[in-house]
Amino acid sequence: KRMLTVCGGPVCVYEAGESNCAPIVLLHGAMYDESRFIWDALFPALGERYHVFAIDTPRHGGSRPWEGELDRARLLEILTETFSLLGLDRFSIIGLSMGGGLAIEFASLHPEKIASLVLFEPGGLGEHVDLQLITWLYLKTPGMLRMLSRRYVKLQDPAIEKLLFTIFTKGTKPQNPARLTAILKDEIRGKFECGENDMDDWQIGAIAPFHLKWNLLEQVRSIACPTLWLRGEKSTLVKQSEMERAVALARENGAQAELKVIPNAGHILPLEQPEQANAEVLAFFDQTLS
């Protein structure tokens, strides 16, 4: 674990593997996610073969407190400086949800730096979200953006473990419930004590009443490296049609892009089907980084 000061704020980085191995960066999702949580199974598996850096995005995990709005542009600025401080000149990125969206945007801006991408259900692929107007009204209602942290921080460990199980797709369960419960408890307390919103500014900034203010489809067209796109078959957050369209766009300029759908998994598929997710990622990197 390393603590960096980046653009005036703290960034926590978990590092594993040998420095002479190919470097891979992992970027987690939004809301109550952090590196220790979503990459619980993948991080150690990658560390046996590669030089791995799992970065806590600002206002997640060990990367707090932060002041001001952390929109797309500011997060990209912070990540770019973080990569520079870590001495990463050419590397691969694995991103999930918000982390996948950030990976797409960085790869489109700096194609010479990215060797390959793995995108677990990246954010930013659609024009709408389900219940768009209701979501927008929720965001605009005073007090709603911190409602969950105020509720969750009062929970005892058994209730947090029960909450953990509810985010897993039916028929799947956490392999390490005690450890993941402790991590989730840390994240809940961190959000509450730092007075953070439940949702990230990256998400909030996209929501309008009837459509999303931006998507990353043009950036997807700019991806030049081999890319593995992974979706949980039962996911309700990123649609199959959105993933298929993105893969087709990525292929337009001749880039290698492949979509794999993992059965009996949802949005957090690295935790729901860790053995299959790990196998797909390792096979892809063995092919593209060898």
Predicted regions mapped to residue ranges:
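Conserved alpha/beta-hydrolase catalytic His-Asp/Glu region
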Residues: 151-225
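Conserved loop-alpha-helix segment in the C-terminal half of the alpha/beta-hydrolase fold
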Residues: 44, 222-265
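Active-site loop/oxyanion-hole signature of alpha/beta-hydrolase fold enzymes
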Residues: 53-94, 130, 279
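Gly/Ala-rich beta-loop-alpha elbow adjacent to hydrolase catalytic centers
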Residues: 95, 99, 103
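Flexible "cap/lid" loop of the alpha/beta hydrolase fold
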Residues: 108, 117-150
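Catalytic active-site module of serine/aspartate enzymes centered on a nucleophile-bearing elbow/loop
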Residues: 253-290
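N-terminal cap/lid segment of alpha/beta-hydrolase-fold proteins
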Residues: 1-10
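Conserved HGGG/HGGXW glycine-rich cap/lid loop of the alpha/beta-hydrolase fold
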Residues: 9, 15-62
